[in-house]
Every structure is written in C-alpha cells, then in structure tokens.
Amino acid sequence: HVLDEKSERLLSYFSRLSGTPGSVYNQLSTADIKFGSITLSTGDEVQISEGEAGRIFATSRNHEDRKAAFIERNSTYNDNINTYAASYDGICQRDWAYAQARNYSSTLEATLENDNIPVDVYLNLLEQGRAGTAPLQRYHKLRKEALKLEEYDGYDSAIPVIDFDKNYDYDAVAKMVKNSIKPL
C-alpha cells in the first residue's frame, strides 16, 4: 500500500497534524483535568485522582467509598465528554483518511497490516472472546458472594476477597527477599 513518490510526499505533509487529536486528549486527560474530592466513611476528605481512585478501589473495604470514588472520577470525565468525543472522532477520521489514501478496504485492515495480522484472525479473536465470558461472569458472581455484597460493580473488582491489611517497609521486604534467595 505504498504510493508513488508525489503521493507519499503529500501525505507526509499531514503527519504533524495527525497527532493533534491524541495531543488534545492527552492535555485534557492529564494537564487540564480537575478532579473533585469525596468524604470517606471514616470522615476523611480525599482529593480524587486516577491513582487515588485506584487505591480506594483496591484497599477500601467500604462499598460506598469505592462507589463514591468511581462516581467522582467518572463525573470529571463526563464533564468533558463532548471534547473527548471530538478528539476520538478526529482519530477515527484521520485513520479513515489514511486508509482510503493507501487503498485499504477499512481502517481495521490498515491498522492490522502493520503487525501482519489478517482481519479474519482479529475478528475470530473477538468472537472467541465474546463466546468465552461465562467463566469470567461466574468469577465475579463468586467474588460478590465472597465479599457479601448486595450489588457488585466494576469498582468492586480490585478489592481483595481476603481482608489482609499488612504493610511492609522497604528494609523488611529487602531482608525477606534476600533470605528467600539464600538457598539458590
């Protein structure tokens, strides 16, 4: 799908522009994003960020705390939903234009060709993934039961089933690692 020299040169003029939608997304989702704060069940006020929300999802035994962190984090993204959508549309339009210019039948074919993956292989992977969700659904059902939750949401999937809350300092861990490899 390589074009003649004149056409390749013409396409190269657009290469800097092609990164604009991704750049807009990155600036909006990192530099310009302003998360709010929540009050946890302990009474502590916490400033939400991606990292803090992840910490709450993975460590808070309180379902309502995890839910509040999820809602606050997602509402921040929802506040800019149209800008995110426009950025994604720009990415789709860019990929479509390049696929058309290089005579691909679809953007999927153009994207997969870089890794030499046939479209049929990719579509089969999706089909098999969809067909094989029953074990994952069962796993989450068992987690819900083990955690004794009335409702189970995505933000409940990171909390350990076993209530184990022990922290180790660096020196203690270093000593344990050294002791564990002594026999080697």
Give the ranges of each region predicted by the language model.
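Long, non-coiled-coil amphipathic alpha-helical linker/lever segments
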Residues: 123-138, 155
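His/Asp/Glu-rich acidic catalytic environments and adjacent acidic regulatory segments
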Residues: 1-120, 124, 128, 171, ...
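A conserved glycine-rich
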Residues: 118, 140-184
